[in-house]
Amino acid sequence: MTKVLHLSHHYGCLKDHQYVCDKLGLDLTNKLSIWNDIIKRDVYCITREIANSTWKEHKDYFNSFDFIITSDTAPLSRIFLENIDEFKGQLIVWVCNRFNYEMHDDDAYLTLMSESVGKDNVKIIPYTKFETMWAEAYKVKFTEEVIRPIGVSIDKPLSENEDLGLIGFGGDYGDELKGGDLLVSRYHNDTLWQDSVKMMEHYDLSADPCKYRGYKGLVELAKKYEAYFILPEQYSKFAAFELMNIGLPVILPSEDFLFHLSSANNYWFGSGLYKNTTEVCEWYNEYYDQFALYIDDFEEIPETFKIVKEHKKKIRGIMKKCAKEHQSKTLDQWRKIYNV
């Protein structure tokens, strides 16, 4: 069985790819930085010294795998790129949060990434089109096609020693939520830029902040609500694909309205939103174009919610079709990468 090691700072990346590896019949080992196992917690700037010392300490272990994949953040790949001539396996760099996160001033790293593109045992794979656009701004040209999150996970620990309390899942994650009309994103724009829950109450709609423990928690929570509302703050979110798979209708600003909102004081959007990049945000991808309910003004929310109520079965049917298509395509993409 093909052996795969996945290193990441991001629990969601590990869970998403765990599903992929399970479906493809791969023998997967996960390492999350918060466990302080191989990679250290909160160490995002991977210098050449850190990369080489980590490689030296774990070289034999690393070479026991057929594939090693790194995800959020991409600089973890430096451990292997600096020592690629000694690495016996295949390296996959799944770029999930800007390839140069915390590495902007390290010219040697930028050169290393650029020179690694196209190597026989290296595949640098963006998880959304914006990652390619961002890299090109730094004269790094990715050649692999985008492979997006599949948006599903399995109810299985990442590791025998997994402790969800260590990654924040022991805190306030919505166990008390009874249900209502709308689940609202719990991130900056819906809580600090404005209070979207209160806005829904102004429109006589019941709403709660979307708090849950992983994919399974979202599946259960979604059963209690009619729709989900978000003011986007990233080009891609695992939640965008999870909501599609679960079949919870999504209400959000149109591209033009989002661009207008993004210019407001204190509205946050990761890496900035520009007129020519709004369209590559995954909340407006070819799937969401078929089922999302876009608004051009907050005043449209009550009528839009009414449409959800009246046509929920049809909307969910479209979401189910899109989810099936997306899962099939994504698994085929990874199947080619792993040659299985």
Predicted segments, located by residue:
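Catalytic core of nucleotide-activated saccharide and alditol-phosphate transferases
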Residues: T73-K178
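Short acidic alpha-helix that forms the nucleotide-activated donor recognition element
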Residues: G214-Y225, N245
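Conserved catalytic-core segment of nucleotide-activated headgroup transferases in glycan assembly
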Residues: I150-L218
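A short hydrophobic beta-strand element within the catalytic core of glycosyltransferases
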Residues: Y228-F229
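Catalytic binding pocket for nucleotide-activated donors in carbohydrate/polymer assembly enzymes
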Residues: P232-E233, K237-E325
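N-terminal pre-catalytic "stem/leader" segment of glycosyltransferase-like enzymes
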Residues: M1-E86, D332-V340
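Structural motif
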Residues: H6-G12, L32-W35, I69-P75, W94-F99, ...
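C-terminal alpha-helical cap of glycosyltransferases
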Residues: T304-I307, K324-V340
